[in-house]
Amino acid sequence: MIVTRFAPSPTGYLHIGGLRTALFSYLWARKNGGKFLLRIEDTDKARNSQEAAEAIVKAFNWLGLEHDGEITYQSQRDDIYAIYVKQLLDEGKAYRCYMSREELDALRETQMANKERTKYDGKYRDFDGTPPDGVDSVIRIKAPLSGEIIVRDGVKGDVVFKAEDILDDFVIARADGSPTYNFVVAIDDHLMGVTEVIRGDDHLSNTPKQIVIYEALGFDVPKFYHVPMIHNSEGKKLSKRDGATDVMAYKEMGYTPAALLNFLVRLGWSNGDQEIFSMDEMRELFDPKNINRSASIYNTEKLDWLNSHYIKNTPNQELAKMLEEYNLTIASHDKKEILLDALKERAKTLKELALLVTEVINPPASYDEKALEKSLKGEAVEVLNNFIAKLSACKELHLPSEYHHVMQEVVDEMGIGFGKIGQPLRVALLGKMSGPGLDSVMAVIGIDETILRVKSALALVK
């Protein structure tokens, strides 16, 4: 069974690159009927944030990325890691190193002066004497000093590292007994039954060390897929301005889970020319072997386009529920179908849609002064007065077409073009010269509110 995992460090909030990795891991597990596990790598006590850890879980819940089983927290597993440190010591595959910080610094300076690679020199690798006084020991693993470490990668192919170029006897447990990052990653991937690791290629340099640990402990090495980074339009690392921000900020900006996940799955993976993917299609079609080897480009316009597509195609009842995030309660509004049908074609984000809804259902808080001056003068005043007179005579109007008919009557009787009524009426109803179809606006707010808004606007220009 394929088992994947997502293993963020809660030293900051979940960002877009991490979410893409999580999505790829989730899809591959679900496609194969496997498990998708969540592990919080919170061993860095100085930098970790409980708030950030909770935000990761919150983001998963918002996006519908269900993980299997309980969340694994590395900070709760020190006793487990200690067992494997002891095993390596007992088997002679690891040893205590007593070099002081001063000795290590001096060694590094000498190597740099000689233009050599900085590394631990193995001083205590085969030490069997009396330990020096007053120096706490770290635990180092006996890494291979020659030969090749081959990372069998599903994206990049076989990546070959020469041991002498990249390895030394690296630390697996600090002087205080706490285990190091690469050590706990290897232990947990084994104990959690992880068979395939999908992660950013910034982790590729860690992989040889993890393979050394797997092999020293007799563990199976998982399959790796190292995914190229996401770059901005200039081919540089994403900044917060480009989109490298907290995932939950996308919710606040008004992006839907479906759009964000669709956007992310196409960053570095494709299925022909297809752009729109439902979650079911993603689960069916995704294969990490089709991940591009080059970096993907973050494109805000593409995200906006996808988001507008999903807004247009979301059932109105569901949209109304989404808008509750913006303190809008329209689920029970008797004209919500007309309202949302008129507006959702105009919005790129839910936040924009919420603003458009507010502008329709509430009278204008202010008016565009230039629009008032340009549109509500001369003949326009007569046109609007004729319109509200006809509207007042109507007992019931419900549909946009019925309001349109009243407008058409005024146009026909006065022998004017439709723009002569449309522009001043729009300013009167919405306070500006742009907006959705007027017949839909009036169908939503009703006869009385329409008349009230027109009279209020006319009062401003008398």
Swiss-Prot record:
**EC number(s) for this protein?**
6.1.1.17
Q: Which residue numbers does the motif 'HIGH' region cover?
A: 8-18
> InterPro entries under this entry?
aa-tRNA-synth_I_cd-bd (IPR045462), aa-tRNA-synth_I_codon-bd_sub2 (IPR020751), aa-tRNA-synth_I_CS (IPR001412), aa_tRNA-synth_I_cd-bd_sf (IPR008925), Glu-tRNA-ligase_bac/mito (IPR004527), Glu/Gln-tRNA-synth (IPR000924), Glu/Gln-tRNA-synth_Ib_cat-dom (IPR020058), GluQ/Sye (IPR049940)
State the UniProt keywords alphabetically. Aminoacyl-tRNA synthetase, ATP-binding, Cytoplasm, Ligase, Nucleotide-binding, Protein biosynthesis
The places in or outside the cell where this protein is found are: Cytoplasm
- Give me the reactions it catalyses: tRNA(Glu) + L-glutamate + ATP = L-glutamyl-tRNA(Glu) + AMP + diphosphate
Positions binding ATP in this chain are: 240
Residue window of motif 'KMSKS' region: 237-241
Q: Top-level EC class, please?
A: ligase
One biological process term in Gene Ontology: glutamyl-tRNA aminoacylation
Q: What is its main location?
A: cytoplasm
Pfam families xrefs: Anticodon_2, tRNA-synt_1c
Q: SUPFAM superfamilies given for it?
A: An anticodon-binding domain of class I aminoacyl-tRNA synthetases, Nucleotidylyl transferase
Top-level division of the source organism's lineage = Bacteria
GO molecular function terms attached to this record: ATP binding; glutamate-tRNA ligase activity; tRNA binding; zinc ion binding
CC terms in the record's Gene Ontology section: cytosol
Q: Subunit comment for this entry? A: Monomer.
Functional note: Catalyzes the attachment of glutamate to tRNA(Glu) in a two-step reaction: glutamate is first activated by ATP to form Glu-AMP and then transferred to the acceptor end of tRNA(Glu).
Q: Which HAMAP family match?
A: Glu_tRNA_synth_type1
What family is this protein classified in?
A: Belongs to the class-I aminoacyl-tRNA synthetase family. Glutamate--tRNA ligase type 1 subfamily.
Checking NCBIfam families in the record gives: gltX_bact
Its recorded name reads Glutamate--tRNA ligase 1
